[in-house]
C-alpha cells in the first residue's frame, strides 16, 4: 500500500516532523500513504496531511487503511476531489488500540511481501531485457 517518493525538495511547508503523518491525494486516483515520524517530506497543493492527535487512541499507520476504504466508498477521484472539507466530514470507526496494532502488524507483513515481490519482478524484467539486448542487438 505504501508508495515510493518522487522528486526532491530543499524545503517543506512543514517544519515539525516529530509525528507520523497520513497523506492522501487530492487529484487523480485515490491514494493514501503513511510517512513515519522524523521522515522529511514536502506536501504539495495536490495532497492533504493528517496528524493523529493521540496515538494511544488511533494509530496513524492504522488510519491509512480505513481512510483508503472510505475514500473508495466515496469514489474520490479527479472528478470527485478529496478536499480537506470532504475528508473532515468522513466518519471512520476505529477498533481498540490492540486490534489496530494487530491489523497493522499483519498488513505490514503483507505489504513487505508485496514489496519484495515487486522487486523480484523488476529484477526479472531487467534480467530478461539484458538477455534480449545481448542476443538481439
Which ranges hold each PLM region?
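A general structural signal for well-ordered secondary-structure junctions
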Residues: 72-73, 113
Amino acid at each position: 500500500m505504501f508508495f515510493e517518493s518522487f522528486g526532491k525538495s530543499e524545503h517543506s511547508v512543514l517544519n515539525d516532523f516529530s509525528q507520523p503523518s497520513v497523506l492522501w491525494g487530492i487529484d487523480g486516483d485515490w491514494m493514501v500513504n503513511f510517512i513515519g515520524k522524523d521522515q522529511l517530506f514536502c506536501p504539495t497543493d495536490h495532497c492533504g496531511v493528517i496528524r493523529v492527535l493521540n496515538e494511544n487512541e488511533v494509530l496513524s499507520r492504522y488510519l491509512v487503511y480505513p481512510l483508503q476504504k472510505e475514500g473508495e466508498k466515496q469514489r474520490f477521484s479527479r472528478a470527485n476531489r478529496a478536499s480537506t472539507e470532504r475528508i473532515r466530514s468522513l466518519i471512520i470507526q476505529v477498533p481498540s488500540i490492540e486490534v489496530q496494532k494487530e491489523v497493522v502488524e499483519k498488513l505490514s507483513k503483507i505489504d513487505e511481501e508485496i514489496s519484495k515481490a515487486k522487486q523480484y519482478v523488476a529484477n526479472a524484467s531487467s534480467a530478461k531485457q539484458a538477455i534480449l539486448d545481448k542476443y538481439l542487438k
